[in-house]
């Protein structure tokens, strides 16, 4: 594969459709851009990468790329142009994804889908497929971990058949990659190409039952979405609306419930880490989304209330046995995602923290809650959490003064939902 690590975008090509779908260009402007592109030489880009940036499913991204390819052919046919030369100018652009196997299968499915589309039109062209490193998986906290994500995503795209890859740098989530980030991206690309020789073997995933099945599933789902769009709006707007409706709750649920681990953000956060300033979040249809953004924003808000100091949460330990250590570590990790430094105190002790959490066994939770509430409130705590599963006693414990419960089922949701309240009363 040809790697282009220092480019922020693939080589200039005609690519008018994403701007229209995102509401940045009118139908008249898009039509004029299409007319100009068809009359000039150069590649015609069938772009699905913006869907990956917005967190759409792999099938939706593939369907949008197919829709763009079909729009180019339909526009050329409407103008009486020969379709074979136009098809020869088509190039696909797909985004990388955080899942190695889904990304690999997506690029394999793309080749099958575009070949099927052109074959049905009686065309023999074989379009090139490009990959763009997307920022949806990148973090502003612990940005060095993005180097691992970048390498995994690039590997998946190459093994899936991408013929060129544009890398953006590990700190590109700030809006502009630094020279150092571009240098490291170049190094990663060179290692994958010159030392790992990933682009030498054609379709190395061929024969893997799991990957063959996943490729077929993605191709089938994408083709069904593409056909549905052709029966409707035909321009991709239906796919964008569907993708937006699905991706927002998917992002929120995956992160807040910690079903998707983000190293350095939701798992193993470093309290000494300084985040790079994030780019301003976009809005509108198919707006780019980053998985880590809600947690990073909540942590930044908490830290802003205590400049020069670290906010503290007091963990009231009600069971000194070693069996409780995993629960204490779990609570520490949850609060650390919002920038809190946890201190352990015996149950009933005074502390200067405005946030407190009871850490005890489920069997002792109801019994020890009154002593915890009395001690925490007398110390000035405004928000009282309990780590554990209260079962049927949840309602009565909350009526007594517990703000919420922290466990595997709730994940980060109680803390993120109350981030504004926590920051307003943090001292």
What do these predicted ranges mean?
Residues 47-53, 86-97, 126-136, 169-176, ...:
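A glycine-rich phosphate-binding loop feature that marks nucleotide/adenosyl-phosphate handling sites
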Residues 58-62, 97-109, 134-148, 175-185, ...:
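Short glycine/threonine-rich loop-to-helix capping motif typified by GTGT followed
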Residues 163, 199, 224-313, 319:
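Intrinsic disorder at enzyme termini
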Residues 66-69, 93-177, 181-185:
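Glycine-rich anion/phosphate-binding loop at the beta-strand->alpha-helix junction
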Residues 344-352:
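Short acidic low-complexity segments
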Residues 40-73, 148-226:
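Mobile "lid/hinge" segments at catalytic clefts and subdomain interfaces of large enzymes
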Residues 1-99, 128, 158, 164-168, ...:
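Catalytic alpha/beta active-site cores
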Residues 273, 280-343, 399, 404-405, ...:
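ATP-dependent carboxylate/acyl-activation modules
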């Amino acid at each position: 594969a040809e790697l282009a690590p220092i480019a922020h975008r693939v080589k200039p090509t005609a690519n008018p459709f994403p701007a229209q779908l995102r509401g940045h260009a009118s139908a008249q402007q898009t039509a004029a851009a299409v007319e100009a592109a068809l009359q000039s030489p150069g590649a015609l880009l069938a772009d699905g990468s913006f869907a990956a940036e917005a967190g759409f499913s792999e099938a939706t991204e593939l369907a949008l790329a197919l829709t763009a390819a079909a729009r180019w052919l339909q526009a050329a046919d409407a103008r009486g142009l020969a379709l074979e030369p136009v098809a020869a100018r088509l190039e696909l652009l797909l985004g990388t994804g955080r899942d190695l196997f889904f990304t690999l299968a997506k690029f394999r499915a793309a080749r099958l889908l575009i070949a099927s589309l052109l074959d049905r039109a009686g065309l023999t062209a074989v379009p090139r497929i490009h990959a763009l490193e997307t920022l949806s998986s990148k973090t502003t906290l612990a940005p060095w971990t993005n180097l691992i994500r970048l390498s995994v995503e690039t590997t998946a795209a190459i093994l899936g058949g991408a013929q060129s890859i544009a890398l953006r740098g590990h700190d590109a989530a700030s809006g502009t990659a630094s020279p150092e980030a571009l240098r490291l991206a170049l190094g990663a690309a060179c290692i994958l190409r010159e030392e790992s020789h990933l682009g030498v073997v054609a379709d190395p995933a061929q024969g893997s039952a799991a990957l063959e099945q996943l490729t077929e599933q993605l191709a089938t789902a994408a083709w069904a979405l593409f056909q549905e769009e052709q029966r409707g709006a035909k321009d991709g707007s239906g796919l964008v609306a569907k993708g937006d409706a699905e991706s927002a709750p998917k992002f929120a649920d995956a992160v807040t419930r910690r079903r998707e681990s983000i190293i350095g953000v939701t798992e193993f956060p470093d309290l000494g880490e300084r985040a790079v300033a994030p780019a301003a979040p976009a809005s509108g249809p198919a707006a780019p989304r980053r998985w880590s953004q809600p947690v990073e924003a909540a942590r930044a808000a908490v830290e802003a209330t205590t400049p020069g100091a670290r906010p503290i949460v007091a963990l009231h330990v009600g069971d000194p046995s070693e069996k409780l250590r995993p629960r204490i570590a779990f609570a520490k990790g949850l609060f650390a995602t919002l920038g809190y430094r946890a201190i352990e105190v015996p149950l009933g002790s005074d502390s200067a923290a405005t946030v407190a959490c009871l850490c005890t066994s489920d069997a002792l939770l109801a019994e020890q809650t009154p002593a915890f509430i009395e001690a925490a409130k007398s110390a000035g705590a405004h928000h009282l959490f309990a780590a554990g599963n209260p079962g049927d006693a949840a309602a009565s414990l909350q009526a007594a003064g517990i703000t919420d419960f922290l466990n595997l089922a709730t994940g980060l949701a109680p803390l993120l939902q109350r981030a504004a309240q926590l920051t307003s009363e943090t001292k």
